[in-house]
């Protein structure tokens, strides 16, 4: 299967996404979270899109960002914006970046686009990719719910905070806390012991 077929509809909606996602929503929350990391730390950005605003903020703050996205159009834009960043056009499930480890992983706006079993796979793969004391930040609604994605018109699924806590605990990961951004998006801050 081509990476763009695993983009959850974002290859087809890439132009609209890039025009809509240039806002700074989430940047202050991600920057607050990243303050616990040492400048220069390696961060894997899963579902990085065109890199704005999350990868951009992390790069500006001196982190070594590795971006992964299944949309060829979004990845092309990412590479143009950040030519020195590591980038891979791939679904996270197939990413070669999981052959190494990272100080942190972010998945902002990705988790709920995935089917439930793939969400659990993502958490498992992140655990394996994190260094000891590595940090993981992802977004998904607190409530267990299903809705239609505004850009792709595809189904989005939140498994709910309690389910995420249980999966994280089963993987040996520690939920450090929850944060919200100015758009009321819920962030789960996780640490690998």
Map each language-model feature to its residues.
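Class I (Rossmann-like) S-adenosyl-L-methionine-dependent methyltransferase catalytic domain
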Residues: 1-38, 49-97, 114-121, 125, ...
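Nucleotide donor/acceptor-binding cores
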Residues: 41-42
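Conserved beta-strand/loop positions that form the S-adenosyl-L-methionine
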Residues: 46
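A conserved beta-strand element that flanks and buttresses the S-adenosyl-L-methionine
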Residues: 106
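Short catalytic micro-motifs in class I SAM-dependent methyltransferases
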Residues: 109-113
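Glycan-recognition surfaces
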Residues: 129
């Amino acid at each position: 299967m081509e990476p763009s077929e695993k983009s959850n509809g974002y290859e087809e909606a890439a132009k609209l996404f890039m025009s809509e996602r240039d806002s700074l929503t989430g940047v202050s929350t991600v920057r607050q979270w990243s303050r616990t990391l040492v400048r220069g730390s390696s961060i894997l950005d899963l579902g990085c899109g065109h890199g704005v605003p999350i990868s951009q903020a992390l790069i500006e703050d001196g982190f070594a960002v590795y971006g992964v996205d299944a949309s060829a159009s979004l990845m092309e834009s990412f590479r143009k914006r950040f030519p020195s960043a590591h980038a891979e056009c791939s679904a996270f499930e197939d990413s070669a970046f999981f052959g190494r480890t990272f100080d942190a992983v972010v998945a902002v706006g990705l988790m709920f686009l995935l089917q439930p079993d793939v969400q659990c796979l993502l958490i498992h793969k992140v655990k394996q990719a994190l260094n000891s004391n590595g940090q993981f930040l992802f977004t998904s609604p607190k409530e267990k719910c299903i809705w239609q994605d505004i850009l792709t018109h595809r189904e989005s699924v939140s498994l709910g905070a309690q389910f995420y806590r249980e999966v994280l605990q089963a993987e040996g990961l520690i939920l450090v806390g929850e944060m919200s951004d100015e758009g009321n998006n819920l962030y789960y801050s996780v640490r690998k012991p």
